[in-house]
Amino acid sequence: MDSFTRASLITFLILLTLTSLVFSNGCMMRGGCFKTSEDAHRLIMQVDFYICGNAIFDTFMDVCRPGPRRRKRDLRRKLGIVMDRKESHKFLRRRKRRVYDIVEECCMEGCIVEEVSEYCD
């Protein structure tokens, strides 16, 4: 690989990285965060919120408790504790084995109300 091609490739990778950082920062303020869907029919889905710590339990109880269900809008309003992705990563520790659970769904990747309801009995 000649030096011009190598320099072009490095420049391209740096610009690509910077572009992804610019567009990923503060996505909640620009109308919503998105993540890859587990559903093969939809490529992208909007994230309702990032929640960590005690807020996960409170949200789980609100979504899974028997009786009248809260509407999504009411649940988001009650959750005034929504945080950005960088802040939510502080709550997680590295694990040797990859385990997907409600903490990883909602704290690290962000989740929607329907994903929380998947953890109900």
UniProtKB/Swiss-Prot annotation:
Localization (cell): Secreted
Propeptide, residue positions: 25-45, 69-97
Record's keyword terms, sorted: Carbohydrate metabolism, Disulfide bond, Glucose metabolism, Hormone, Secreted, Signal
SS bonds (residue pairs): C52-C107, C64-C120, C106-C111
Pfam families membership: Insulin
InterPro entries membership: Insulin-like, Insulin-like_sf, Insulin-rel_pep, Insulin_CS, Insulin_family
Leader sequence segment: 1-24
Protein role: Insulin decreases blood glucose concentration. May have evolved to activate insulin receptors (INSR) in vertebrates. Molecular docking studies reveals unique interaction with the human insulin receptor. In vivo, insulin-like peptide injection reduces blood glucose levels in two models of zebrafish diabetes (streptozotocin- and glucose-induced). Also shorter swimming distance of zebrafish larvae, an effect which is not observed with human insulin.
Family named by the database record: Belongs to the insulin family.
Protein name, entry field: Insulin-like peptide 01
